[in-house]
Amino acid sequence: MAANYSSTGSRKEHVKVTSDPQPGFLERLSETSGGMFVGLVTFLLSFYLIFTNEGRALKTANLLAEGLSLVVSPDSIHSVAPENEGRLVHIIGALRTSKLLSDPNYGVHLPAVKLRRHVEMYQWVETEESNEYTEDGQVKKETKYSYNTEWRSEIVSSKNFDREIGHKNPSAMAVESFTATAPFVQIGRFFLSAGLIDKIDNFKPLSLAKLEDPHVDIIRRGDFFYHSENPKYPEVGDVRVSFSYAGLSSDDPDLGPAHVVTVIARQRGDQLIPYSTKSGDTLLLLHHGDFSAEEVFRREQKSNSMKTWGLRAAGWMAMFMGLNLMTRILYTLVDWFPVFRDLVNIGLKAFAFCVATSLTLLTVAAGWLFYRPLWAALLGCLALVPIIIARTRVPTKKLE
């Protein structure tokens, strides 16, 4: 099926060298001015990211605390208790579905919440390595383009290659990837809402060892179905298909017992739906495994804390990069003097580090003002430390 496309030989590569006149002072100054605008936008966005992150973190913490104080655990999942109607309930049990999920084209059938068909095509892939250097007053860029064949799940457009001749890929796959989802999923007598079903994403690879070749033109090798004349030596355009599943919904002699999950949700009849809190937020949790209600909320609080620190770090980094770009023009003004240029570069980075750290702490404190005023005041004092240190070092250097 790959006869119309490039044959797969050994790894191919070629080198291209381009040259441009070395930019003058005014040209470099103009480029730096553009970087200042990008830096300003990045700098301002960092404030928004840090401030809103604090609001989100505290809001989530309060939401989880409220949920833990309200949650109840029914005596049995095999009966619907009327006294829990509208309440936040803690449910543990094995998943069940009403019918098998299948892909008849490949003879795959199994009890699961989700069945995913993953398709890859053998294609040419271009990689490039660049090296810039100055020679005879010109800036030269040497780029090495390499071409190799790989299995890829996305179409690689050979039209964007530096050299398409001899490395042409098909424009579409003969088979498409898809995910089938069971329409109804239960735990005991309770039906899971669409939001809970979406959270069942613990995909595991499906072994094809006991399946036969579904068609004459499809060959099974290991855990793949190959649309290829020779899977051992594939050609560009050949396709291979694998399967994975999430949420095993029945005991299976080959795949194991049905998957057990822990759910925190609102009971409405025999439905498990999102719970609306007093603050207007919704609570809908699903964890893979058997956990007590306290353990579920403890895991959620830990996840919230990790996300908060991750976004704080991202905000600080955005602020640091923004300040670097905004002050880059000072480096450009002195880059004709190597020794002085290096000193200025170190000083600008130290300045950006101190200012980014101080402003990040101040922004975090501002985000806490509405929730924890005392902690906000403490953070505000800590935020002044880097600035005080930086200012006290300046007179010392002058005296030296």
Curated annotation (Swiss-Prot):
Record's keyword terms, sorted: Acetylation, Cell membrane, Endoplasmic reticulum, Immunity, Innate immunity, Membrane, Nucleus, Transmembrane, Transmembrane helix
GO molecular function: identical protein binding
Domain of life: Eukaryota
Subcellular location: Endoplasmic reticulum membrane; Nucleus inner membrane; Cell membrane
Bilayer-spanning residue ranges: 32-52, 314-334, 346-366, 369-389
Membrane topology: Multi-pass membrane protein
Annotated InterPro entries: TMEM43_fam
SUBUNIT field: Can form oligomers through the transmembrane domains. Interacts with EMD; the interaction retains EMD at the inner nuclear membrane. Interacts with LMNA and LMNB2. Interacts with SUN2. Interacts with RNF26; this interaction is important to modulate innate immune signaling through the cGAS-STING pathway. Interacts with CARD10. Interacts with gap junctions proteins GJB2/Cx26 and GJB4/Cx30.
Lineage, uppermost ranks: Eukaryota, Metazoa, Chordata, Craniata, Vertebrata
Family listed: Belongs to the TMEM43 family.
Modified residues (N-acetylalanine): A2
Reported function: May have an important role in maintaining nuclear envelope structure by organizing protein complexes at the inner nuclear membrane. Required for retaining emerin at the inner nuclear membrane. Plays a role in the modulation of innate immune signaling through the cGAS-STING pathway by interacting with RNF26. In addition, functions as a critical signaling component in mediating NF-kappa-B activation by acting downstream of EGFR and upstream of CARD10. Contributes to passive conductance current in cochlear glia-like supporting cells, mediated by gap junctions and necessary for hearing.
Organism: Rattus norvegicus
Protein name as annotated: Transmembrane protein 43
Region (Disordered): 1-23
Membrane topology (Nuclear): 2-31, 335-345, 390-400
